[in-house]
Amino acid sequence: MSGPQKPAVAVALTYEFGKPHLPRVVASGRGAIAERILALAQESGIPVREDADLVALLAAVELESEIPAEAMIAVAEIMAQIFLLNRQAQAAAADRR
């Protein structure tokens, strides 16, 4: 038998490619707010990744603050995957023309 389900937790980041700044936390929440963040990401075609340890670390960061150094490797790996997906989508779109 499983215990009560923990409320959802979600964190959204932004990053300006080519800028010398770290990614920033632009949204964070639990429960209904987390569900809304996830729904908006899905509606906007923004990739979502589940990582309980990373979200726990990032959820403690104040809004509009840069991510902590401890999170940089994990976030960089996620961003690399997103950039690769974007390039693949652009190449596929160019092939259809």
Residue ranges of predicted features:
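Divalent-cation
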Residues: 1-97
